[in-house]
Amino acid sequence: MQICETLKADGVTPFVLGDGLSWDAPHWYGALWQKFVPEDVLEGQDFNVKTVTIDDPGYVNGLNYFTDLLDKGYFNDNINSMEHNMALEVFYAGEGAMAYVEMLEFNDINKGLDGDFGFFAMPTIEDDEAKGNQEKLYGAPEGMIVNPNSENVDVAVDFVKFLTSVESQQKVVSEAGHTSCTIGAHTENTIPQLIDGMAYVQNFNGMSNWTDCGFEASIVDTMCKLGQDFAAQSITAEDYVAGLQETAKVVREQNAE
């Protein structure tokens, strides 16, 4: 917060955010929920379609933390009218100090900022109400799943092994400019920020899945739709969570045994 105040005092917007596609702001909310909601509740109870309730106080507390950042002027204006790529262009132009991005975007950001950037994970939140696992990273590796009921499962598995081999993934990094989860895919030609990022990931204490992947799909739809209303401050944190709870109730009933 002190750094944000210093930036703001110098006329620099601390955070750039564009939620025009409705998923960027929920990534912020999810990261804060991971810090505020107990791990067994978020990942154990609420990622399960049979038990999801979304009624832990940490959901509202996490959203109120975001509102506090908004009220202090730490974000750009017109969050909902900018898409993610537009927000990054604003970031590249020096009109914001920080942007919340995925590691897979590092190569693009390297081009946009001519290699002059650093990174850090979402910091620990020192608040008595922050009852989540502060040691985990919020996010997930990208991957592929083979349907066990499909035809030619063995062939599909062999193909996935080929795609995820070190040799194939080195091409993904060097030719496509993408990030790879395969150890050994990043070579001396990889940008240093990405090498440092992958080293960080290999030594983390676990990952908490994106809420737009962990929650059931209809809950995610509600999360994204109401998320824009919340970012615009046209609804309260309590209103937002109540909407999620209504959808969660339907999901539980649909999956009741």
Q: Which functions belong to the PLM regions below?
A:
Residues V16, A97-E102, G118-F120:
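Paired acidic/hydrophobic, glycine-rich loop segments that form the ligand-binding mouth/hinge
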Residues K72, K111-A176:
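Extracytoplasmic/periplasmic substrate-recognition and gating elements
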Residues H84, V101-F106, A121-P123, E142:
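Beta->alpha turn/N-cap motifs
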Residues D19, F36-N61, K111-G112, T124-E135, ...:
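Short, solvent-exposed loop/beta-turn-alpha elements that line the ligand-binding surface or hinge
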Residues Q202-E257:
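Conserved C-terminal helix/tail region of periplasmic/extracytoplasmic solute-binding proteins
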Residues C4-T6, N48-I79:
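Glycine-centered hinge/linker elements that transmit conformational signals in sensory
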Residues M1-K50, G96:
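Extracytoplasmic/periplasmic solute-binding protein
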Residues D77-Y92:
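Short helix-initiation/N-cap motifs at beta->coil->alpha
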